[in-house]
Amino acid sequence: MERTLRNARVATFVYFALNGFLLGMWVVHIPAVAHAVGIGHAVLGWLLLLLGLGAFAGMQLAGPLTDRLGARTVVPLGAALCSAAVVLPGLAFDTWTLGAALLLLGFGNGCLDVSMNAHAVQVESGYGRPVMSAFHATFSLGGVLAALIGARTLDRGMAPAVTLAAAAVLGLVVAGVTARALLPAAARAATAEDAGTGTPAGRRTPRRIWILAALALMLMLCEGVANDWSVLHLRDVLDAPAATAALAYGAFSTAMTAGRLLADRLTGRFGPVAILRHGSAIAALGLTAAALSPWIPLALAGWAVFGAGLSGCIPQLFSAAGHADSDAAGVNVSRVAGLGYLGMLAGPAVIGPLTHLVPLNLTFLLPVAFCVVAAGAAGILRDPGPEPTRQGVRPRTETV
């Protein structure tokens, strides 16, 4: 059993890294694909919304399927779909084909995202201690690997279609080879259906899950703000050189990855409530410092603190959603991930119009407020069951 669980954990790491790698390969090729298709920033912005809509649709489908068929079936299928779709933007020849390609890529990403997080919850249940944050850190590392490879291939003049095709083949191979190491479907889910209680997908989503989803929306909006506006903040507000301004996002993402590598150990020691409460508070302080600082070094430090504070928060929400009901883990994770993803997409849409009313740096007080709300609502992570544990993770059960 221990070897099976250990192999499943390694496989989950692989799928998270693969997801980050595939999305990262698309991101680094966005300028080249947009130039090849002949579209400007405005049209590209609308097309990227299709990526998000496709992901949201995939998440809502993958959640019930994961509960019905098990993550062992849905994760490889989602990974294969995401891998096959990553080449499509490189083959697009006009706006319509690029839009269709992004819709399919988003759909595959959504299917993989929810199913692999549901499997991560299953692995975490088997270990009886927090392991979710490390999986999310591996996703970030996959994106870093994609950035390094993509930069190298672009520098050598390779066509996006060629590089993305190679990434697709690699993803398909990895998805197939790793599938056997995943855990089988939980026995309890089949028992519940046989007893006539109905499928998990047909149940009413508890209020606690919607609260977790609302917190995910707010905190992932904060992450989206950093992704889209941190560099512009240093460049346009503090007049930093382009190379220096780029360090803002680098500081944020590096601190977030490092924080997630440490978050599981901290969660095991202090509990998920403390991680969400103090992490959100630290993030609020960091972003406030970045927003109000007239000095570039302090602003960079603020963005780094913002990333470190946020790093452990989202994994706690995903973990709590998955552990709330083992028979409906996929559906519950899809609710939290779906609204969270919409929040990340809403970041640019919310901040942009606000800049017509106040300076860019003052618009960051909105995500600061969201962090404060998350800190105040951290108690929602307390296990409502009769036997809560300090880690907020149920002890090993027959699901593994």
Predicted regions and their residues:
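Pair of pore-lining "gating" transmembrane helices in MFS-fold secondary transporters
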Residues: 2-29, 35, 103, 206-222, ...
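Short amphipathic helix-loop junctions that connect adjacent transmembrane helices
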Residues: 28-42, 228-244
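Interfacial helix-cap and linker-helix signal at transmembrane-aqueous boundaries
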Residues: 33-34, 65-66, 152-157, 234-235, ...
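Helix-breaking motifs and short loop linkers at transmembrane-helix boundaries and internal kinks
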Residues: 38, 70, 91-96, 239, ...
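Conserved MFS/SLC helix-loop-helix module at the cytosolic interface between two early adjacent transmembrane helices
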Residues: 57-96
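Helix-to-loop junctions at the C-terminal end of transmembrane segments
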Residues: 58-71, 154, 259-272, 355-356
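Intracellular juxtamembrane helix-capping segments at the cytosolic ends
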Residues: 111-125, 312-325
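Symmetry-related core transmembrane helices of the 12-TM Major Facilitator Superfamily/SLC fold
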Residues: 161-180, 364-380
